[in-house]
């Protein structure tokens, strides 16, 4: 099934479910590190809410968009609650309530997510801040909440996913324009780069438009997304995962295990923007001001092991956890073990040349009044 429509992507875009060896719960260490790097921005956002007297409303409504199933969303809840308690003590204010909405697409494993919730995360109802948690399935590219209902929005490593594979990647004759690749590469024609940027522009604008209606004036958004430092979208730093996956798929094509047409017609619905591209879209939309924006780099392999096979296998599991549902939809569930085994071998070979660092973008926005 080609990912050419929004409805189809919604059905297959989610992290690996459950708590098994290939699950996102067991393989979210990298996004956990990214989230921890961005926690100061979230803490500052909560401080800002109190400086704008939102605590006088006695309840703060927060949403974590694209929450997935791992421990990261629990860290977000704990951080917001801890900062609210800190400000309550400083301001000697009365007991506050925190309502947290955890959102993701319908395929997300909400059962595992809620099973992981504990009193450690949400506390009890007699504390300074009473915390209530609710699941909200649906696409954040459209409306999810009533108008002017959210004070704080958080999203980590979700906004770079697209609603569909970019439009216009086949010629008038029906030929694939990104043949042999699943993302932008050095060999991709300019039209592929333009199509990806255009799709991200359209989708991120929809995201901002929906939030502009849901977030209260002066409310805050803290967004963390995968991005790039270079102005070139085919820079290896931003596309090496998709390059290595495409090589693994191509090898299985050469072995007759995957139809070549399936590779040629598959384009991953994801885009890693530059800081300039993100800034331009926010300013064009005009609903939010940029309070803070920065890019930071992390080693793609956040591991201490010296054994390159151990490191390669762990990295492959991390990638499998967030790519398998959408990859298996195109190429078949029965081929996944072979594909990711091949991917592991390719990663280990690349470790000799050292994998590029991964760039993340932190974006803190405030809803414009009026």
Curated annotation (Swiss-Prot):
Record's catalysed reaction(s)? 1,3,7-trimethylurate + S-adenosyl-L-methionine = theacrine + S-adenosyl-L-homocysteine + H(+)
GO molecular function terms listed in the Swiss-Prot or TrEMBL record: metal ion binding; methyltransferase activity
In Gene Ontology terms, what is a biological process of this protein? methylation
EC number in record: 2.1.1.-
Sites where the protein binds 1,3,7-trimethylurate: 31, 157, 160-161, 226, 322
Report the domain of life of the source organism: Eukaryota
Name the organs or tissues of expression: Expressed in leaves of cv. Kucha, but not in cv. Puer.
Q: Quote the pathway field.
A: Alkaloid biosynthesis
- Binding residues annotated for Mg(2+), in chain numbering: 178, 264, 266-267
Q: Which cofactor does it need?
A: Mg(2+)
Q: What else is known?
A: Caffeine is catabolized to produce theacrine in Camellia sinensis var. assamica cv. Kucha, but not in cv. Puer.
Family statement drawn from the similarity comment of this UniProt entry: Belongs to the methyltransferase superfamily. Type-7 methyltransferase family.
| Name by which UniProt lists this protein | 1,3,7-trimethyluric acid N-methyltransferase CkTcS
Organism equals Camellia sinensis var. assamica (Assam tea)
Please state the gene responsible for encoding this protein. Answer: TCS
């Amino acid at each position: 099934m080609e990912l050419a429509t929004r409805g189809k992507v919604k059905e297959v875009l989610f992290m690996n479910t459950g708590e098994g060896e290939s699950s996102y719960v067991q393989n979210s260490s990298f996004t956990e590190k990214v989230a921890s790097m961005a926690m100061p921005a979230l803490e500052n956002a909560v401080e800002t809410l109190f400086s704008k007297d939102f605590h006088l409303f006695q309840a703060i409504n927060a949403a974590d968009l694209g929450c997935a199933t791992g421990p990261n969303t629990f860290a977000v809840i704990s951080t917001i609650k801890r900062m609210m308690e800190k400000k309550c003590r400083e301001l000697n204010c009365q007991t506050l309530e925190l309502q947290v909405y955890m959102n993701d697409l319908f395929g997300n494993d909400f059962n595992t997510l809620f099973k992981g919730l504990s009193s450690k995360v949400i506390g009890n109802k007699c504390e300074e801040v009473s915390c209530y948690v609710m699941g909200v399935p649906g696409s954040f590219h459209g409306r999810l909440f009533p108008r002017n209902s959210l004070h704080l929005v958080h999203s980590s490593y979700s906004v770079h996913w697209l609603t569909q594979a970019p439009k216009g990647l086949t010629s008038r004759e029906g030929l694939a324009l990104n043949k042999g690749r699943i993302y932008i590469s050095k060999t991709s024609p300019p039209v592929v780069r333009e199509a990806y940027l255009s799709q991200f522009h359209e989708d991120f604008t929809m995201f901002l438009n929906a939030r502009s209606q849901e977030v209260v004036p002066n409310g805050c958004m803290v967004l963390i997304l995968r991005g790039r430092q270079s102005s070139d979208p085919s820079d290896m730093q931003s596309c090496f995962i998709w390059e290595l996956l495409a090589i693994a798929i191509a090898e299985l094509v050469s072995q007759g295990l995957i139809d070549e047409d399936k590779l040629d017609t598959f384009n991953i619905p994801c885009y890693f923007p530059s800081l300039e591209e993100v800034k331009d879209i926010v300013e064009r939309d005009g609903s939010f001001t940029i309070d803070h924006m920065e890019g930071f780099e992390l080693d793609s392999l956040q591991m201490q092991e010296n054994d390159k096979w151990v490191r390669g296998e762990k990295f492959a599991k991390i990638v499998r956890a967030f790519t398998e549902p959408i990859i298996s939809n195109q190429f078949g569930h029965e081929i996944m073990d072979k594909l990711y085994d091949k991917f592991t071998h390719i990663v280990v070979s690349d470790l000799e040349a050292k994998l590029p660092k991964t760039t993340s973008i932190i974006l803190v926005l405030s809803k414009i009044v009026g």
